[in-house]
Curated annotation (Swiss-Prot):
InterPro entries: SAICAR_synt/ADE2_N (IPR028923), SAICAR_synt_PurC (IPR033934), SAICAR_synth (IPR001636), SAICAR_synthetase (IPR050089), SAICAR_synthetase_CS (IPR018236). Pathway: Purine metabolism; IMP biosynthesis via de novo pathway; 5-amino-1-(5-phospho-D-ribosyl)imidazole-4-carboxamide from 5-amino-1-(5-phospho-D-ribosyl)imidazole-4-carboxylate: step 1/2. It comes from the Bacteria. GO terms for molecular function: ATP binding; phosphoribosylaminoimidazolesuccinocarboxamide synthase activity. SUPFAM superfamilies: SAICAR synthase-like (SSF56104). It comes from Synechococcus sp. (strain WH7803). Belongs to the SAICAR synthetase family. PROSITE patterns: SAICAR_SYNTHETASE_1 (PS01057). This is Phosphoribosylaminoimidazole-succinocarboxamide synthase. Keywords: ATP-binding, Ligase, Nucleotide-binding, Purine biosynthesis. The keyword Ligase applies. Signal peptide: none annotated. NCBIfam families: purC.
Length: 250
């Protein structure tokens, strides 16, 4: 189904954003595109957009039930979401509960090491630069966020982790790490934006001890493990089984 929408405002690797009749809201279309390594690796995966849209809707509503503000308004169709219009902050927040990925490549920390408290990393959102890791001094030099806003961003990200980590554990999933995009709405409120899905979270099946079989996230695509849509579908099934039906704005 193609919804009635306004002009295309932005197209990213996984979503298209369109104007809507309400100037404080936009329509987000989740695409079937799969990308990795800053879009150097690409593929089309049927049903990926639908699965990520439905998972994100459930998780945004979960966060809101715990008092965490998000840009989410509701779903308009299987692959379409209505969200508040926000100014996305060009800093990506990554929360790491378990050491893996780039952390293990860049440090001597062993794969699978539990991180308590969770490690919070900040990255500058710029594909051309490879989304570099930021230091305190570089954040101050760039001047993209004030010290006060940065503190709010970090506090909000840790609140998200405090909700998602036990939620996924109850579903038999380990929330290894995840990335967040945050934005400011027209009232200046800081909101969780973008999406929360296996594209943005590393999720391991707690019932599996096999290092590859347990992966239920985008690493299946990155590492050519196959079964990407089956893994996303399993996450969607578990999440939807634990959440009410998402709000419908269609």
């Amino acid at each position: 189904m193609t919804l009635s929408h306004g002009e295309l405002l932005y197209e990213g690797k996984a979503k298209r954003i369109y104007a809507s009749a309400d100037d404080q809201q936009v329509l987000v279309e989740f695409k079937n595109d799969a990308t990795a390594f800053n879009a150097q690796k690409k593929a089309q995966l049927e049903h990926k957009g639908r699965l990520n849209c439905q998972i994100s809707a459930c998780l945004f509503e979960l966060l809101e039930r715990h008092g965490i503000p998000t840009h989410y308004v509701g779903v308009a169709d299987a692959t379409w979401m209505v969200v508040q219009r926000v100014e996305v902050i060009p800093i990506e927040v990554v929360l790491r509960n378990t050491a893996t990925g780039s952390l293990c490549r860049e440090t001597p920390i062993p794969q699978g090491t539990a991180l308590d408290p969770a490690l919070l990393d900040l990255y500058y959102k710029d594909d051309a630069l490879g989304d570099p890791l930021l230091t305190d001094a570089r954040i101050a030099l760039l001047g993209v966020v004030s010290a006060e806003l940065r503190q709010r961003m970090e506090a909000l990200a840790r609140q998200v982790n405090a909700v998602l980590q036990p939620f996924f554990k109850d579903l038999g999933l380990q929330l290894v790490d995840f990335k967040l995009e945050l934005g400011l709405n027209q009232a200046g409120e800081l909101l969780v934006a973008d999406e929360i899905s296996p594209d943005t979270c590393r999720l391991w099946d707690l019932s599996s001890t096999d290092a590859n079989e347990r992966i239920l996230d985008k690493d299946r695509f990155r590492k050519d493990l196959g079964g990407v849509i089956e893994a996303y579908g399993e996450v969607c099934k578990r999440v939807q089984g634990a959440c009410p039906q998402p709000r419908n704005c269609g």
